[in-house]
């Protein structure tokens, strides 16, 4: 009874449990605060606010002394020797600007797009110049500092909607005045007017020990590897390997290590001795921890025996130095070895002096891990586990690039300073700093997508891509893409497979088909990528909480029983009460004293506690559960709804939700829904859950969240729809009239779907839809919908069904060839202009531009432009004198027609005149156009019947589309059938149907609802044949389904040719529709003709219609002879033959081949049969 009462007033009770509806309130709060491209923006802001300053602070000051002029390398010996040094200090970034008529002005993103500018902000830096005079020994040392304020060092492209973008704080009205769309999420750059995205790059985790088993062909059985890199500063990673060899017939072999800059593999024990641990006992204490462990001690024996010879640190260092790159005296070698051990080996542990203890402990730990794996006590690592992956977003990517460019800049400053000192000139900061280095370096990489400076070799391509603007969903999806930089050729299946740990982080369905399958992924809806925070606070906290530091451990055997503590892969100490430490850390994270994105992983089996604060980890939010109760209650929901101040951030800081990354996820138990937390009355086992999913449908990404009932479809169908949803036409952005995109498709009358999912709200799919609700019947009706084609209703098309507008923009610029010759926009005249096209010049005005509203057809000139010819020499005769200019106009594409929509004439960044012309054409659906439902069921239009020829129901309803029933059974897209049923209910009741996956909507419930309205339960209806008016035998499944028109239209693909342009080299027809090329009769077609025995046809295709050519050959030697047909004289000079010459026909390509063979002294002799 009391239970019943509790449920009754759950609305008023603030401590009541939450309902399914409340969960969506929380999700809405998340997206309101985060948006959909937060990961891009946060990462970029981190780069601007912290990384750039760090990089500049890290770079050492430039210090120089004057060199003697005649003995380079020797310092001038005199009393008043000055030492100059230059140090870069604080940086400043101003608002985005651009040069307009030589004046720097603020620029809005839309201006940048239209005028092909780069949306970037100038970067300034303070430079401190120090001059030291006199000498220390005499005590008259003087030092003068001079601070040069705000020296311009380059421009940094700004990500739209980031902290430094002018759209950051703007509200909807401001955005409209700036010509921006309020739905646009930002997260991309504008480089030379085109929008560029940085695709997140996946990589292996640094500073983490991996142990892998090697297969027989390799000579090692187990390999432990670690990619080590310092926390601050992206110095390149140094990788270290420890290798365990297979036991040979001579007995067991020792463990070898690969040390950076040392050419051979070195025995492990020698490395320990070089670190200063000489006695065997000391070394084994660092590796085995427990001397009672006989098996492990046995494994170490061969290693100790093999390094028995070397018994002191000096000898060990010399052993390493000998195998290094520098050969010198013994002292130099030892110094080299010490340097390598300090700076290059495991740099993440320490690069400071007195590094030995820490490094020995860590090195021992790596060895320990290798031994554990070879004893099969600890499982091997999984390369594809998502905890072992990190994502490089815009921040780290720009960071590495900026570091390389800044290095280059300092090098230039150094050279300039040296010149100043040698010539005793004044040091002028503005001329010392080449601002172009950083500006053009960043611009080049973002424009081409080639990442990394050209010479260092580490270039990746395809990192920056042009933002896809076909549909709004395709734009969003492109901003949330992940790329794995593995060669696409490798047929490796493992990295491509869906891994358990992808749950909730990567969309399971959205990935391309073909060679990039599984390597290009997309983020799930609520996935969050850590920005990274400093590890210092955590280290200080551990220090307070009785962590034993590695240097302080008195009894080394206690390591075996204690828990090791790692922070970002660095072993910082051991602890004897890990459970207390763990709960304290979690508590601190939940109340916000430690950053929310820190992950705390306790590995109980391996006695390790790993803490991570690094950037690029994938996390996702979950509800916190304590004592099997969700911490979020009705009161929090009410606050979210009613209180504008209460946001997602407050839920985090109150410890109601928390971010869990892929590694910590392995140590928690997650309930699927809050209902799962209520224990069944008769269940034996009660699970102790620690967290609860917010909503299972959040495992999907952008494109799959548009699919209704994806949990009722066969999985590849969802993948196909994810790819096709990106090609659907809709309104791709609301300011499309103000933009000049190269290509754009806009549907005339987009509709929001009758059957929606809850996630669509956050994708703005209701405001910017890409499709229409059409009435679909599943029937055969004539044979015009076989093999995935569909029958359309011509009358509906005439009323505007699926009509769309296609825009294409053409651009041109008056470039300067030289100082004298400048191109001009004008109407070219035939008598003064050389090289004019065959298109019509009538449409353009005298200023060289076509007026808006003019109808243009293929090959018409729309931008007239002339280039002056260089004044020619007199001896070329009078013929060339007439022409003073050359025509370099832009013509409309030959296969298109349309109406000029908009013409913009402006100046480009360099101050030249520059224009863009946009042409629009209406596209009416016709036979051959492609359509698809939201379930991967694509089809082309096979026939369009008028309304009176189509079947109709009792109510007089005529379908708009008829789909063939054969498309359903083998593809198992049951989701489409349920959508049709639910659509029928929605259309009748006027409510939106909810098709969110993993909810409790059942087909039975929908059928019942349909039955109530008065339709047949399964959605079938009696229909009448449109041709005869008779009742059809079968009942037909009919109802509204959401269909998309895809961008593949027959008008853009139709192509034929009789005669046309040929290639110069082979004289065969060129390839491609845009060049009016031929249709290739390929090898397979040739083989078919051979098997048919159609010899004459074969000759016609491959010879007469392709590149027939007439050659004269000498009958004596069989080589090509000289023929002059005008004079009717023939001769072969080799044979002194003028009479015995034959004329033959052969393909021009064969003639070319023969001549190339002749150039290589091979004589292909041809003899005719007389």
Swiss-Prot record:
Q: Name one GO cellular component term.
A: mitochondrion
- Please give the catalytic activity noted in the UniProt record: RNA(n) + a ribonucleoside 5'-triphosphate = RNA(n+1) + diphosphate
**What Enzyme Commission number(s) apply to this enzyme?**
2.7.7.6
Q: Name one GO molecular function term.
A: DNA-directed RNA polymerase activity
**What name appears for this protein in its UniProt entry?**
DNA-directed RNA polymerase II subunit rpb2
Q: Where in the cell is it found?
A: Nucleus
Function according to Swiss-Prot or TrEMBL: DNA-dependent RNA polymerase catalyzes the transcription of DNA into RNA using the four ribonucleoside triphosphates as substrates. Second largest component of RNA polymerase II which synthesizes mRNA precursors and many functional non-coding RNAs. Proposed to contribute to the polymerase catalytic activity and forms the polymerase active center together with the largest subunit. Pol II is the central component of the basal RNA polymerase II transcription machinery. It is composed of mobile elements that move relative to each other.
Q: What class of enzyme is it?
A: transferase
What's the further remark here? The binding of ribonucleoside triphosphate to the RNA polymerase II transcribing complex probably involves a two-step mechanism. The initial binding seems to occur at the entry (E) site and involves a magnesium ion coordinated by three conserved aspartate residues of the two largest RNA Pol II subunits.
So where does Mg(2+) get bound? 788
Locate the region Disordered. 864-893
Q: Per its UniProt record, what Pfam families does this chain match?
A: RNA_pol_Rpb2_1, RNA_pol_Rpb2_2, RNA_pol_Rpb2_3, RNA_pol_Rpb2_4, RNA_pol_Rpb2_5, RNA_pol_Rpb2_6, RNA_pol_Rpb2_7
Q: Which CDD domains match?
A: RNA_pol_B_RPB2 (cd00653)
The positions annotated for binding Zn(2+) are: 1114, 1117, 1132, 1135
């Amino acid at each position: 009874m009391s239970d019943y009462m509790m449920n009754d007033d759950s609305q008023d009770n603030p401590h009541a449990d939450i309902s399914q509806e409340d969960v969506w309130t929380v999700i809405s709060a998340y997206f309101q605060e985060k948006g959909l491209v937060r990961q891009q923006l946060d990462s970029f802001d981190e780069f601007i606010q912290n990384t750039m300053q760090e990089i500049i602070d890290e770079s050492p000051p430039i210090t120089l002394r004057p060199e003697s002029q005649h003995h380079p390398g020797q310092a001038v010996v005199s009393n008043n020797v000055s030492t100059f040094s230059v140090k870069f200090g604080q940086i400043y970034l101003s608002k985005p600007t651009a040069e307009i008529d030589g004046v720097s002005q603020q620029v809005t993103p839309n201006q940048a797009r239209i005028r092909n500018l780069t949306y970037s902000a100038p970067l300034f830096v303070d430079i401190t110049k120090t001059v030291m005079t006199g000498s220390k020994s005499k005590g008259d040392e003087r030092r003068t500092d001079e601070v040069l304020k705000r020296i311009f060092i380059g421009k940094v492209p700004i990500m739209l909607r980031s902290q430094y973008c002018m759209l950051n704080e703007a509200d909807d009205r401001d955005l409209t005045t700036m010509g921006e769309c309020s739905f646009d999420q930002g997260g991309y750059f504008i480089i030379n007017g085109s929008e560029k995205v940085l695709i997140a790059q996946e990589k292996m985790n640094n500073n983490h020990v991996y142990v892998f088993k090697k297969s027989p062909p390799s000579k090692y059985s187990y390999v432990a590897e670690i990619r080590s890199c310092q926390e601050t500063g992206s110095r390149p990673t140094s990788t270290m390997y420890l290798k365990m060899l297979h036991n040979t017939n001579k007995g067991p072999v020792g463990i070898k290590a690969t040390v950076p800059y040392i050419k051979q593999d070195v025995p492990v024990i020698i490395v320990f001795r070089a670190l200063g641990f000489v006695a065997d006992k000391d070394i084994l204490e660092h590796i085995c921890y427990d001397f009672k462990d006989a098996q492990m001690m046995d494994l170490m024996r061969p290693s100790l025996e093999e390094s028995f010879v070397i018994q002191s640190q000096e000898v060990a260092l010399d052993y390493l130095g000998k195998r290094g790159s520098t050969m010198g005296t013994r002292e130099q070698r030892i110094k080299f070895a010490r340097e390598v051990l300090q700076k290059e080996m495991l740099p993440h542990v320490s690069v400071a002096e007195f590094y030995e203890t820490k490094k020995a402990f860590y090195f021992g730990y790596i060895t320990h891990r290798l031994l554990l794996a070879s004893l099969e006590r600890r499982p091997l690592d999984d390369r594809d586990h998502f905890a072992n992956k990190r994502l490089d977003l815009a921040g780290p990517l720009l960071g590495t690039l900026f570091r390389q460019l800044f290095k280059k800049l300092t090098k230039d400053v150094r050279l300039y300073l040296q010149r100043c000192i040698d010539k005793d000139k004044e040091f002028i900061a503005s001329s010392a700093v080449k601002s172009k280095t950083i500006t053009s370096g960043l611009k080049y990489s973002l424009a081409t997508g080639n990442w990394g400076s050209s010479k260092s070799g580490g270039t990746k391509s395809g990192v920056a891509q042009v933002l896809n603007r076909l549909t709004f969903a395709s734009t969003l999806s492109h901003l949330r893409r992940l790329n794995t930089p593995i060669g696409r050729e490798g047929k490796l299946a493992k990295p491509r497979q869906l891994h358990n740990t992808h749950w909730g982080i990567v969309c399971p369905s959205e990935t391309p088909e073909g060679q990039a399958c599984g390597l290009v992924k997309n983020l799930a809806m609520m996935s969050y990528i850590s920005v990274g925070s400093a590890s210092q606070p955590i280290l200080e906290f551990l220090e307070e909480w009785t962590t034993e530091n590695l240097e302080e451990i008195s009894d080394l055997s206690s390591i075996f029983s204690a828990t090791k503590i790692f922070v970002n892969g660095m072993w910082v100490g051991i602890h004897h009460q890990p459970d207390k430490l763990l709960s304290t850390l979690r508590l601190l994270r939940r109340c916000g004293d430690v950053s929310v994105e820190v992950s705390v992983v306790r590995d109980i089996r391996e006695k390790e506690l790993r803490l991570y604060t690094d950037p690029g980890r994938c996390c996702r939010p979950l509800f916190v559960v304590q004592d099997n109760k969700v911490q979020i209650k009705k009161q929090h929901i009410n606050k979210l709804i009613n209180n504008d101040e209460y946001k997602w951030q407050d839920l985090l800081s109150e410890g109601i939700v928390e971010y869990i990354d892929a590694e910590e996820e392995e140590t928690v138990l997650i309930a699927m829904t809050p209902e799962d937390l209520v224990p069944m009355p008769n269940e034996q086992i009660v699970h102790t859950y620690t967290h609860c999913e917010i909503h299972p449908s959040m495992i999907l990404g952008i494109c799959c969240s548009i699919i209704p009932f994806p949990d009722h479809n066969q999985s590849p169908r969802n993948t196909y729809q994810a790819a096709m949803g990106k090609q659907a036409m809709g309104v791709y952005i609301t300011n499309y009239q103000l933009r000049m995109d190269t290509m754009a498709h806009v549907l005339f009358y987009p509709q929001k779907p009758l059957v929606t999912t809850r996630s669509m709200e956050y994708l703005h799919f209701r405001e910017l839809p890409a499709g229409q609700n059409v009435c679909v019947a599943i029937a055969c009706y004539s044979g015009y919908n076989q093999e995935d084609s569909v029958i359309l209703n011509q009358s509906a098309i005439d009323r505007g069904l699926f009509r769309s507008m296609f825009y294409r923009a053409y651009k041109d610029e008056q470039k300067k060839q030289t100082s004298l010759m400048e191109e001009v926009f004008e109407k070219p005249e035939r008598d003064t202009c050389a090289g004019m096209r065959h298109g019509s010049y009538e449409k353009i005005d005298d200023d060289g531009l076509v007026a808006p509203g003019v109808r243009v057809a293929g090959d018409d000139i729309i931008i007239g432009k002339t280039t002056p010819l260089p004044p020619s020499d007199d001896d070329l005769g009078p013929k060339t004198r007439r022409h003073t200019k050359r025509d370099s106009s832009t013509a409309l594409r030959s296969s298109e027609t349309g109406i000029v929509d908009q013409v913009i004439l402006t100046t480009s960044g360099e101050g030249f005149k520059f224009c863009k012309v946009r042409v629009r054409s209406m596209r009416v659906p016709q036979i051959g156009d492609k359509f698809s439902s939201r379930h991967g069921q694509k089809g082309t239009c096979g026939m369009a019947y008028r309304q009176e020829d189509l079947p109709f129901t009792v109510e007089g309803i005529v379908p708009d589309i008829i789909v063939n029933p054969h498309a359903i059974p083998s593809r198992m897209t049951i989701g489409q059938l349920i959508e049709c049923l639910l659509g029928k209910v929605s259309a009748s009741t006027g409510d939106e149907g909810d098709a969110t996956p993993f909810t409790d909507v059942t087909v039975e419930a929908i059928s019942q609802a349909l039955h109530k309205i008065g339709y047949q339960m399964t959605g079938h209806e009696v229909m009448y044949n449109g041709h005869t008016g008779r009742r059809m035998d079968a009942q037909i499944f009919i109802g509204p389904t959401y269909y998309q028109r895809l961008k593949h239209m027959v008008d853009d693909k139709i192509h034929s040719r009789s005669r046309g342009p040929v290639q110069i080299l082979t004289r065969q027809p060129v390839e491609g529709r845009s060049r009016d090329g031929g249709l290739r009769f390929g090898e397979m077609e040739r083989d078919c003709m051979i098997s048919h025995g159609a010899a004459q046809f074969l000759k016609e295709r491959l010879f007469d219609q392709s590149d027939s050519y007439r050659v004269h050959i000498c009958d004596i030697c069989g080589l090509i002879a000289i023929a002059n047909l005008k004079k009717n004289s023939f001769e072969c000079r080799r044979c002194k033959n003028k009479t015995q010459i034959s004329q033959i026909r052969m393909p021009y390509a064969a003639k070319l081949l023969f001549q190339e063979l002749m150039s290589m002294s091979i004589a292909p002799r041809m003899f005719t049969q007389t």
